[in-house]
């Protein structure tokens, strides 16, 4: 089913969405404008060579998705160009995601690890939402180091980091390319059910409440509570 529009709680969200629609003739407004909400909007086909493109340089803080393309003859060249584009053209350094087939990772070999190392982002997710890094208290969460008060972008410093890493640069998260049970048919031994943070997981609220209870007192007896709910794949 279709999820309803989310509340745009950032001040000025409605005006920013309207400005984007007015300045981009190809903008697609996905929803009818609901009362007191901001409709989801998509702007496709931006020119990656346009250094003045506002959507590359400003954070919307509203449900606007934009897409662009970069050249590349083969995965290796494409990945290098994509990393360069992100580092040099996009404003903000908090999180980035690479969606990549496991076979491509294997084919690229060390070049894939080099690409991760070159990305100037505080959290890099490989086939997983980078925001999971915020949910894991062990990982440092913050912008890539190097911002100043004159150009603060995504901020300075870190939160969480319960393992007390000294001067961390970035966190890298890996997730399964195939969701369970399809992963089993592809030879990937991952048993991850539909993640509880997915909007279509009907058990998400129950799972997260029970995991919160476990985090509160670390009583192993609480573990059987959320696991059966998770195994139901959000049904």
Q: What does each of the following model-derived ranges do?
A:
Residues 1, 19-26, 117, 121, ...:
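Generic surface-pattern signal
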Residues 16-17, 52, 112-115, 207, ...:
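Generic structural signal of hydrophobic/aromatic residues within well-ordered alpha-helices
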Residues 207-235:
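C-terminal non-catalytic accessory extensions
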